Amino acid sequence: MARVMLSQKHRITECGSGEEYMISMYENIVFDKSSQQHFKTLFDILCKDLDGAILYHCTGGKDRTGITTLYLYTLLGVSEEDIIEEFSTSDIFNKKYNKSRETLIKIFMPTSKRTKALLIALLHAKREYLEAVINKIKDRHGSVLNFLYDEIGITKEMQEKLQLIF
């Protein structure tokens, strides 16, 4: 993780702050055509008649997983405020993990204090990250649900199937 974060420090610095970088990263996850195709594949799998459970996660459990959960909960009819609140709980559950990563950054990363502060900001699941990308989606599509229909390729039938399954 430290190598990836260090390799991205120029992009982080260009954005001005860790928070701005995170918002731009979330926008990339949402609006990148390749990412959209991966999300479509995920929802195709979720709509299949499968035995057992499906688990999804990522390294930190907040970025790609957070966007996936935004999409799934939207399709299930969960309120936007509840989705954002749920996303924000990631910081509670990752508190120990984040603390250890902060310590590693402070001690072992050969970079300035400012860059370290920016990198530390990346560890957190701030509601502002998700709110910003939701607002950008709404600006372009009117709602997250419209975005899922227009860009991800979700159909009303898929949404109804997911509501039956979950």
Spell out what each predicted region is.
Residues 1-55, 68-166:
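Cys-dependent protein tyrosine phosphatase-like superfamily
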Residues 59-60, 64-65:
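Ser/Thr-glycine-rich phosphate-binding loops at phosphate-binding pockets of nucleotides
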